[in-house]
Design a protein with these regions (language model features):
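Short, Lys/Arg-enriched N-terminal segments with co-localized hydrophobic residues
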Residues: 3-24
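Compositionally biased, intrinsically disordered low-complexity segments enriched
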Residues: 9-11, 73, 194, 244
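Functionally critical loop-and-helix segments that line ligand-binding/catalytic clefts
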Residues: 20-51, 160-250
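Substrate-binding cleft of extracellular glycoside hydrolase catalytic domains
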Residues: 21-142
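Flexible, glycine-rich phosphate/dinucleotide-binding loops
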Residues: 65, 93, 154, 178, ...
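Aromatic side chains
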Residues: 70, 87-89, 148, 174, ...
Length: 251
């Protein structure tokens, strides 16, 4: 747990677990290339044995581009006993093609997070997210899908259709207060509460100055079930990309 975290967030607990009133929370983190690459794009592996996170999400794909060293990073996280799953960044460029790209790499994963937010000139809308999800299902993906977004972004670019109620939501709010209710989702299951975690508490070795931190609401058993019940899917080398779109990489 980050130094003085209990004080800053009115939480109590140790060993990656806390509580707010009767609600149990488990500490996690999320990471992208900037957490495991150096200035020369070389691999600086996260030392997962020093990470206080119980679970972690790692960026696998940036639209239709592979994240360098993702396969190595998630394998190392799992070998260290972390519950680990991929997330993918959605752009407002041909969501079905992006889903094709993700499926080729992540079809065996029991859980995928789709990152639904803006970056630069890319401002995906709910129809981009819908088409990406439906294409994954059309291709045969049967695992869980979590939507990552922010309250205000969803109000501006999501909608309140009942369709979205089937998906767990992971909400970002860098605050001591949990995210606001975000229709039409039920309460978030994961809260990204900070982007300023101490790198030393998460095994960062490349000199990065801050880490994204998350709380999962629930028990260890519920967390393990979310991540596939302990199943470890195979990690194969990514296939050669069949399409190319010029997109800046975002961690």
């Amino acid at each position: 747990m980050v130094n003085d975290l209990a004080h800053r967030h009115s939480l109590s607990g140790v060993g990656g677990r806390a509580s707010v009133g009767e609600e149990k929370m488990i500490l996690g983190s999320d990471h992208g290339i900037w957490d495991w690459a150096n200035e020369d794009d070389g691999f600086c592996p996260i030392d997962w044995t020093k990470s206080q996170s119980v679970f972690t999400f790692l960026k696998a794909c940036d639209g239709v581009w592979d994240t360098p060293y993702y396969a190595e990073s998630i394998a190392m996280a799992r070998a260290a006993g972390k519950l680990a799953a991929p997330y993918v960044w959605l752009y407002n460029v041909d969501p079905r093609m992006q889903a094709d790209f993700w499926y080729l790499r992540l079809a065996d994963e029991p859980l995928i997070v789709i990152d639904f937010e803006s970056y630069g000139n890319s401002i995906p809308d709910y129809d981009d997210l819908y088409n990406a999800i439906e294409r994954l299902r059309e291709l045969g993906y049967t695992g869980k899908i979590i939507v990552y977004t922010g309250h205000w972004y969803w109000l501006a670019h999501g909608n309140t259709a009942d369709y979205w109620k089937q998906f767990p939501v992971w909400l970002a709010r860098y605050s001591s207060a949990p995210p606001q209710p975000t229709p039409t989702f039920a309460k978030e299951i994961i809260w990204q509460f900070s982007a300023s975690g101490n790198p030393a508490n998460y095994g960062i070795t490349n000199g990065k100055l801050a880490v994204d931190e998350d709380w999962f609401y629930g028990t260890q058993e519920q967390l393990e079930e979310l991540f596939g019940g302990g199943a470890v899917p195979p990690i194969d080398p990514p296939p050669k990309p069949q399409h190319k779109i010029v997109i800046k990489i975002r961690s």
